[in-house]
Amino acid sequence: MPFLAPPHLPSSHNKIKQDPKPGPDTGQLASTSDTAGKPLIEMRDIFKVYKTNAGEFTALKGVSADFYPGQFVSIIGKSGSGKSTLLNMITGIDRPSSGKILIGDTYLQGLSESQFSDWRGRNLGIVFQFFQLLPMLSLLENTILPMDFCRMYTPPERETRARDLLELVGLQNFVDKLPTAVSGGQVQCAAIARALANDPPIIVADEPTGNLDSRTADMVLDLIDELVKKGKTVLVVTHDEAVARHASRTLVICDGELVDEDISRILPHISHRSMLMIAHEAIDFTRKPGENIFSDSGEIPGMVLVIEGELDIRNSDGRKTASAKSGSVIHQSYIKKSIIAGKSIVPGTHGAIRLKVISEENLQSIKTQSRSFRAFMEKLEVEEAIYSSAKEEGQA
């Protein structure tokens, strides 16, 4: 092969640093800079298998992810991909078949149902897609309920806080109304107020803007922004592209697997299944400045993704003629054209680079299975160009 062999990559991402002791720590987590640099939520190798009359169905397949304080994370995927199941693992609405979940210093599988219920009430604000409020209680009473359940704040403080939260979502004139007396969008807003009642460090929402008009949805997104600024961690399952664009981080789930975030970031326009196939076949490389990555001997890779750093394309005299920055895609045709012209493709001078490389054989296999990916690659092949915001130096 013309590219150097990849070094051994540590698999620390798939392990929780220390096996946490199962314990009944049901206090409230910190959501401030006290936890800076440390994940607030750690999920490791989560599997969820359901037994049905038709046999076993695996909804989650080895999911591992970290979520940090102050992140607004959107989780997207097709219906049935595992989005809601993933949230249910965090909220305890369902339990994983195997794997570990650590939130703060609390090992969730070590909690009994009653301990989990108390812990959840203090640490998670949950906005469901359906069945939001108790129909026999007013919006005010629904918002007070989590504070009553967890014995947080004094009774007068609970009512004051509930009224303030309902005003925050524009429902100050409807506090005494029953859920059946207001619109679906207003019920959704009241559910958001209720989720914030105990000032939890983590907000989990399943389609929080699904029943809202555009104006109210914008208000909810602004509210989420304010919560994130205060250090809250917000996880949202959504089909709404506006919500996904608003998030600081987007996870794609497909067939129960999380798609590699670098691939979904660089190739957002191809199908989720294509992203997953690329993630399965890609090989990781890390290279230092000065190392020539490709040569004219052996097989040329079908596609290269620049994950971190910058690749320089240089003439034989060392002059840089083009660059491929983080987020770039380089087709085999561009690499061949550069090599034939006597150019070298090397890491930039500012530091090491990280690449994902896919062989020509695997690339062709993916192209035959995905129309959107095939069209994208054919366009790159015809143009013999680098797909990125980087441009040939000197060109407009």
Predicted regions and their residues:
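Helix-to-loop junction immediately C-terminal to a conserved catalytic motif
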Residues: 91
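ABC ATPase C-loop
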Residues: 171, 175, 195-196
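Conserved ABC ATPase signature
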Residues: 178-182, 186-188
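Regulatory nucleotide-sensing modules
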Residues: 263-316, 324, 330-332
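Cyclic-nucleotide recognition modules
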Residues: 319-382
